[in-house]
Swiss-Prot record:
Cofactor(s) essential for the protein: Zn(2+); Co(2+); Mn(2+); Fe(2+)
Residues reported in the UniProt entry to bind Zn(2+) 1: C9, C14, C36, C40
Protein name: Methionine aminopeptidase 1
Organism: Pongo abelii
Superkingdom of this protein's organism: Eukaryota
Stated role: Cotranslationally removes the N-terminal methionine from nascent proteins. The N-terminal methionine is often cleaved when the second residue in the primary sequence is small and uncharged (Met-Ala-, Cys, Gly, Pro, Ser, Thr, or Val).
Gene symbol of the encoding locus: METAP1
Cofactor: binding comment: Binds 2 divalent metal cations per subunit. Has a high-affinity and a low affinity metal-binding site. The true nature of the physiological cofactor is under debate. The enzyme is active with zinc, cobalt, manganese or divalent iron ions. Has high activity with zinc; zinc cofactor is transferred into the active site region by the ZNG1 zinc chaperone.
Listed SUPFAM superfamilies: Creatinase/aminopeptidase
Mapped zinc finger ranges (C6H2-type): 6-59
Keyword terms: Acetylation, Aminopeptidase, Cytoplasm, Hydrolase, Metal-binding, Protease, Zinc, Zinc-finger
């Protein structure tokens, strides 16, 4: 760390003189960030590093090359970045949509860095919350509403529709149900849902690219209502797709459902990855390792951690009253991923397609309840597109 003029340490609760500044902040041009010692710096790292991410994201947005299509849409906003596949972002993004003040908001909604302090307080713990009957009813409600919103998005999937238009509809549908769209400002995510097209594994940011015939697109919805989050996603076909896309999406859904069939008290969370990877590999596909299922209730992401790959080291045994997601991401090629310069969009390193399905589950005495199931059909939407 570089020596600087004397300042007051920025660690919460410390008023010592600070003579050291974070070297990364100096490099990124972030003002302030003074600490009295390496110990204070390390103790503040979990929160402090978010400043780096935000600064990098803002820098990436400024590094705009020449316009490459007609009008005001830029399909190459990050000069020099080598894309892994054919998909390109369509910038600039539309402005972040407001949420009315009467809608109850999670703790990160108005945080300048989008940080959830309630999640940070429990970071690193492996203790899994047992939900009360009141908690369970809260989860049933928000998951049912999240399903309604995903079904609205499903009805919009066709060539020519932009993911920005889907996000707009999702945002309005959340507000109409007195819900906050959980992704919005979660660690500064700029939209109300995630839309992941073709080689995008997850966390795709809705933009003005029209969906094209032959695409596959995942829409990931999470709602917040009365203090609880409900989370689900599905992958859809855009018009007519090739046989490879059909097999990938079908297999991904089967991976999810086979894992769900194993959920009951006494099962180790690590076992789910063995089930998922066995089925994926039997069909010639790979399983993403960087992103996992998670506990969910009053916190968006919490224990347990639920990896989808085999021989993982996940901690915990299922008990009645646990609520968590399973959301396998299955790839045509290799499982390795990288992230676009926007800091969010995860893509396959080889540029091949990836699909995903997700449900929020409640462990019961004899098995599990799929809280985000369709109420009008036992089939996912893509099966109606065959």
């Amino acid at each position: 760390m570089a020596a600087v003029e004397t300042r007051v340490c920025e660690t919460d609760g410390c008023s010592s003189e600070a003579k050291l500044q974070c070297p990364t902040c100096i490099k990124l041009g972030i003002q302030g960030s003074y600490f009295c010692s390496q110990e204070c710096f390390k103790g503040s790292w979990a929160t402090h590093k978010l400043l780096h991410k935000k600064a990098k994201d803002e820098k990436a947005k400024r590094e705009v090359s020449s316009w490459t299509v007609e009008g005001d849409i830029n399909t190459d906003p990050w000069a020099g970045y080598r894309y892994t596949g054919k998909l390109r972002p369509h910038y600039p993004l539309m402005p972040t949509r407001p949420v009315p003040s009467y809608i109850q908001r999670p703790d990160y909604a108005d945080h300048p860095l989008g940080m959830s302090e309630s999640e940070q307080a429990l970071k690193g713990t492996s203790q899994i919350k047992l939900l009360s009957s009141e908690d369970i009813e809260g989860m049933r409600l928000v998951c049912r509403l999240a399903r309604e919103v995903l079904d609205i998005a499903a009805g919009m999937i066709k060539p020519g529709v932009t993911t920005e238009e889907i996000d707009h509809a999702v945002h309005l549908a959340c507000i109409a149900r007195n819900c906050y769209p959980s992704p919005l400002n979660y660690y500064n995510f700029p939209k109300s849902c995630c839309t992941s097209v073709n080689e995008v594994i997850c966390h795709g940011i809705p933009d003005r690219r029209p969906l094209q015939e032959g695409d596959i697109v995942n829409v990931d919805i999470t709602l917040y209502r009365n203090g609880y989050h409900g989370d689900l996603n599905e992958t859809f076909f855009v018009g007519e797709v090739d046989d490879g896309a059909r097999k990938l999406v079908q297999t991904t859904y089967e991976c999810l459902m086979q894992a769900i069939d194993a959920v009951k008290p006494g099962v180790r969370y690590r076992e789910l990855g063995n089930i998922i990877q066995k089925h994926a590999q039997a069909n010639g596909f790979s399983v993403v390792r960087s992103y996992c299922g998670h506990g969910i209730h009053k916190l968006f992401h919490t224990a347990p951690n639920v990896p989808h790959y085999a021989k993982n080291k996940a901690v915990g045994v299922m008990k009645s009253g646990h609520v968590f997601t399973i959301e396998p991401m299955i790839c045509e090629g290799g499982w390795q991923d990288e992230t676009w310069p926007d800091g969010w969009t995860a893509v396959t390193r080889d540029g091949k397609r990836s699909a995903q399905f997700e449900h929020t589950l409640l462990v019961t005495d004899t098995g599990c309840e799929i809280l985000t199931r369709r109420l009008d059909s036992a089939r996912p939407h893509f099966m109606s597109q065959f």
